[in-house]
Each structure stands twice: as C-alpha cells, then as structure tokens.
Amino acid sequence: VEHGYVAGLMAGNALATHDLEGSMFHTALGQDIYTQKSHPNGHYNHLDVINRVRRSGSIAQFIEDYNIDNGIMYSCVKNNVPFVLTGSIRDDGPLPEVIGDAYAGQTAMRGMVKKATTVICLATMLHTIATGNMTPSYRVLEDGTVRPVFLYTVDADEFVVNKLLDRGSLAATTIVTNVQDFIMIVAKGLGIL
C-alpha cells in the first residue's frame, strides 16, 4: 500500500478490525503479535477497537483520534486507497464502513474489480470466491486497447484456492503458500524491502 502497488482493497469486517487492533494494542485476538503472549482480558481488544471506531464515526476519524500510525487500514486512509468492507452474519460490531447488505456489498465490489488490471486474493475463501466470480477476464482501456485482467489466489490450503477454479474462474492462477511468505517474496522482488 505504502509503495503504490494497491489501488483498492476489498475485505470483510475482520481484516479491518484485527488490523486496527494490531495497530492500537499490538495484539491479534488478545495475543501479542510478536511474542504470542496473551494479554489479560486481551480477547476483548477487538471489541474495544470496534466500539472506539464506532464512537469516532469512521475508520479515518478513529485513526486521527487515536494517532494510529501503522497497519493496512492506516495505509489505505493515508494514501487515499479506496476500500470496500463487506459484512457477514457473524460479524462483531461491525465497523461503520462495513456494508451489511450483501447485494450492496457485491455492487461496491463489482465497481472496484471492473477497474482492476490485476487482482490478488489473499487467504479469505469467501471473498476470494466472490471476487473471482465477479472479476472480468479482460478490460477495455480508454484508448480501446483490450487488456487481460490477471487474477491470483494465495492461500496455505489448496482446497481454498482450488474452490475458485471449481466454480468456473478458469483465468485464476492459484498459489498454495503462506500469505506472509508470499507478501515478503513479492516485496523483495519489487525491491521495496
């Protein structure tokens, strides 16, 4: 995001919530991100974050109110990268920007993918399948050039990446690996690490 390689982000309430939890408390579901030590009552941290974001009124205002200076959502806000957060029936909260109506969420996602030239889906099965099903295989640029849209799915579970292929997204390239390793290798390849 910081280096301009992300033009849009599509995710669920969980990615944004846990990213903001990590930014604010340095925990993920109450465990320290780096040491994995549990914090006392840390399992409430994500709920505390949701309530603070809701009190602030938006993710951007929360970032300003609490001087958040790291994380995916921080980088999206700082760099004006649009994001679409869609909800699930089992979401905590959710955060203010989360679209709870499935059809409105799909419409917002379609609006983002129709502008894409490359789509990379990272370790979220339901969003990956939804995105794959709505991503066109080509795009016509303003000058009339027809350009393919590249679609990659990355997950440590081959069942997840193959599920998209099983549903007819034949243009998808699947990569079975740990997402963190994938991101680090790509970042090194781009020379940004």
Name each region found by the language model.
Residues I33-V81, S88-V119, T124-L193:
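C-terminal functional extensions of proteins
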Residues V1-S56:
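Metabolite-binding pocket within alpha/beta catalytic cores that recognizes anionic/polar moieties
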